[in-house]
């Protein structure tokens, strides 16, 4: 009997979660996500561009009362390994826009809604290029002060963001959140376990 109740609760939870996700026209999955563009609030603008000949799909978040004739600091937000722009990267992009920044969260190439084959691959050099591509795109966005661009990398995106900032002087500030350096782990093993072997 208990197992039937547990199964029923799990099914009900999946249905409710799927229903909640379908209610958001942008596919955002976090609480209080932008669900429609409203004057005087943070708005979301789906965009697309190319990096290395492959289509990239992104969301730009503009602050409440955005005025393209003003100059705003911009922040690129890199998602975790295996993540997509609708998850934690979108949450941070929205919260930063609520603080007055213009932000961009993009699906890395080969992942999410962006193009590229084979799917669901995560190569450090590509992810670093993707961050450069976000900087390229956001620096041309109306209202962005291209001399004031920052970057936030989450989990694996944190390591890639540090790599991108090393070679891109347009990125003036970097922050990471729960950073994981995939490149270092691939070279040296987890916690540098392969260095002395």
Where are the language model's segments positioned?
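Short beta-strand element of the alpha/beta-hydrolase
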Residues: 69-80
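The serine-hydrolase catalytic nucleophile loop
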Residues: 82-94, 108
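N-terminal cap/lid segment of alpha/beta-hydrolase-fold proteins
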Residues: 24-70
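Alpha/beta-hydrolase-fold enzymes
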Residues: 150, 160-197
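Alpha/beta-hydrolase fold nucleophile elbow
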Residues: 142-155
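Alpha/beta-hydrolase active-site loop
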Residues: 121-142
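Glycine-rich "HGGG/HGxG" loop immediately N-terminal to the catalytic nucleophile
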Residues: 87, 110-122
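Conserved alpha/beta-hydrolase
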Residues: 95-115
């Amino acid at each position: 009997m208990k197992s039937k109740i547990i199964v029923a609760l799990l099914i009900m939870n999946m249905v409710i979660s799927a229903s909640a996700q379908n209610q958001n026209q942008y596919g955002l999955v976090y609480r209080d996500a932008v669900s429609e563009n409203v004057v005087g609030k943070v708005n979301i603008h789906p965009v697309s561009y190319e990096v290395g000949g492959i289509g990239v799909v992104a969301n730009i978040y503009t602050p409440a009362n955005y005025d393209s004739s003003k100059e705003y600091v911009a922040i690129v937000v890199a998602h975790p390994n295996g993540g997509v722009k609708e998850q934690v990267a979108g949450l941070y992009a929205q919260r930063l826009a609520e603080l007055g920044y213009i932000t961009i969260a993009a699906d890395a190439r080969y992942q999410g809604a962006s193009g590229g084959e084979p799917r669901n691959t995560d190569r450090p050099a590509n992810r670093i290029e993707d961050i450069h591509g976000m900087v390229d795109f956001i620096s041309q966005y109306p209202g962005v002060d291209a001399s004031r661009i920052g970057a936030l990398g989450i989990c694996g995106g944190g390591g890639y963001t540090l790599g991108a900032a090393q070679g891109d002087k347009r990125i003036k500030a970097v922050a990471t959140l729960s950073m994981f350096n995939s490149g270092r782990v691939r070279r040296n093993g987890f916690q540098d376990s392969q260095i002395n072997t």
